[in-house]
Structure formats: structure tokens, C-alpha cells
Amino acid sequence: MLVTLATRTFTPEPTAAALRLGALARALAAGGDTVRVFTSRLASSVARDARETGESQALADASGDTGEGSGLVEVRRAPVLRDRTGAVRGYVSYMSFDLPLLARLLGGPRPDVVVSEPPPTTGVAVRLACALRRVPYVYYCADIVSDAAALAGVPGLVVRTVAGLESFALRGARRVIAVSDGVARRARELGARDVAVVPNGVRVPEAVATGVPDGFPTCSGPVFVYAGTVAQWLAPEVFVDAFERARERLGDARLVFVGQGSGWDGLAARARGVTGVDLIPAVSADEADRWMARATATLASLRPGGYDYAYPTKILASLAQGTPVIYAGPGQAARDVEESALGVACSLDVDEIAEAMVALASGAASWVGRDGARAWVREHRSVLASSRAAAAVVRSALA
């Protein structure tokens, strides 16, 4: 079977979508399918890190070459407009990927099935191309973009337009993969017909990442790391406020943001002049692992109200490296962190986050330990299990 993945982000980029779709490609190839990936050219900082760690190896990993009977993954990258942080974000950037994508999907060998992922404009391009070629497609619904836009305070007309595009993409899909029950519920409300829930998983390496990442602080105190997307609906600026409040009790501490996103400039403005806060542009997934592995604790957040069903994948990535998490937000992620002693869960409150930083830095917080955290991810959020389940959904689109 020939499967085409249409995605603006793919491994070795350090995004949840890139890691999720890389795992799906490996699972499909391991089952004997041929996978063709239409994606974007890497951001310069990610490409540099990938060259240093060996991008050829990263792509070999993505090929899923597991021996006899394995398929092949072919990754085709095309130029795309990125913002100043290196992200493909905003509708000008989206169009720079989606319009050429339509032509790419209409050319070449006819696939048996196409897999699309957000944003909705990509889903629209996929639906149009698949209708013309009479090919079924699967929509991998990791989030509801219109809900995130509403939470970010985007004007109502824009939110309604995005919701219309999202509904169009979902209604045309033969099957939809949702990463949580909450996402599945909203997908059905927007018109999805056949939805399967496959929770996100992450790979737990045999050993935690080693080596010192470029730019890692040489300080005597704790280092808190926020690695991943920076956006208004995630409210990452609250960690700057909390760090500033707890600074005197943390000694020679550092707070480091490693990533990109629509909220990057605003975060930089908020952090300007705050001692001990650094911002590092997006790095490769391997380099992000090294940042998380060496951190005292990693940080994740979610603004409550309308998007509470989201589960930040950066939590799982941190635990896979044996590092505790401070999660400020609602939902299942908070329950997991609290009930399984995976760090500290609190509300999106400056004082509570400040206390969590002090508790983890001093060893006062309940913590299952490095081995315990990694074991929890293996048992509950294995990427091997999730990618196999997602691959089964993709194959079922032909049934």
C-alpha cells in the first residue's frame, strides 16, 4: 500500500506533530507499506542541528527499516515561508505550504490513502486533491485549531472561518484519528463521521540523552526548561512571572525557553530585563531531548477555558528523559502528574508555580524518580503502541 503523509512538519523537527507522524511513518513501513511524505524544508537552526547529529541517521530512523518485509519512507521537502522564530505559523506561511501541496498531491503515483494533519488549510488542500483523484484520506486530529484560536482571542469572524475550514476537512475524511476523547467529541461536533481515539505517545530511549546542549547554562542553581511551542493559548509567560517571584529562593537559577511560535516575540518582550531568563531558537528533536534530560524540571502550561481537553506532549517527552514536570493547567495531564508523582501540577497561577519551582529545586516535591517516570511512560504512553494503533486506522480506511 502506498500512503502519502501531508504535513508541514516532520522529523527531525522537535514538534509534537513531527514526532507523532514520524512514528506513524515507521509503523506503516514496519508493516510493509510504502510511505511518501510531503513536508517542508527544515528551518535553518533545525537543519544545522540535524547535520551535526547526522540527519541521514534521522531519516534512516524515520524509514522504519526493521528488516525483511519493511516498507520504505521517502521524505520530499519543499521550500516554505517561516516566521522569525522558524515556525510555519500563520496563514501566509500555511498557504506557502498548502497551495504547492495541492499540486504535489495531484502529481506522481496515485496513493492508496493520504494522511493529513492540522492546520485546517492543509486538510482542505488534501480533501480537494483526494476528491479529484478519488483517494480516501485520514485526518490526524491532534487538536481543534478553531478552539485554540478562540482561546487566543482571535476575532470572531476569523474563528468562524477557521471552524468552517476545519469542518470541511473533517467531514471529507474517511476516518479521523483523535488524540483524546475531548478532541474526538469536538471533531464529531464539527462533522467528523468515523473517529478513532489514539492517545499521543512518545519514544522512551534505552538511555536518557547525554551531552551538554549548546547554550546550556553554567550556573550552580536549578535550570528550568520550557521546550516547544510558544503560543498565547499556552500562556508560557506565566513562568517568567513565577521565576521572577521565586528568584531569591532559587539561588543561581536559570529559566530557558527553547522553541518557536506565535507568542515568541511577546515572550521575549516580557523576559527582557529579567535576570536568569534565556530564549533559544528551535533546535532538533535530539537537541531538545538533551535540554530536557539535563534540566532540573521542565515546564508545561495550558490556559483554562475551552481547550481543557488538550494534553501537552512536552510533558511526556520530558518524562521519557527522566525529568520531572511542572504543569500549570487543567485536564488529564494535571491528574496524571499529581496522581503518579511525575512532578508538580498546579493551576495557572504565579504564586503556585513559584512554589512548585522551589519545591522541585529543594527536593521537597513528590517525585517518582527518573526510572519510575520512564517506566510510567512506557506503560501508559508508549509511542510504539500508539503508532501501531494509528497505522491500523490508516489501513482501515481502505476496508
Feature roles, as predicted:
Residues 348, 364-395:
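A charged, aromatic-enriched C-terminal amphipathic alpha-helix characteristic of glycosyltransferases
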Residues 234, 284-291, 296-319, 326-336:
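Nucleotide-sugar-dependent
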Residues 339-351, 358-365:
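Conserved acidic donor-binding segment of nucleotide-sugar-dependent glycosyltransferases
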Residues 221, 250, 265-289:
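Nucleotide-activated donor-binding/catalytic signature segment of Leloir-type glycosyltransferases, i.e.
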Residues 41, 182, 201:
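Carbohydrate-associated surface elements
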Residues 124, 128-132, 157-178:
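Membrane-proximal helix-turn-helix segments that form the acceptor-binding/catalytic region
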Residues 1-68, 246-248, 384, 399:
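N-terminal subdomain of nucleotide-sugar transferases
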Residues 215-247, 256:
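Conserved donor-binding/catalytic core segment of Leloir-type glycosyltransferases
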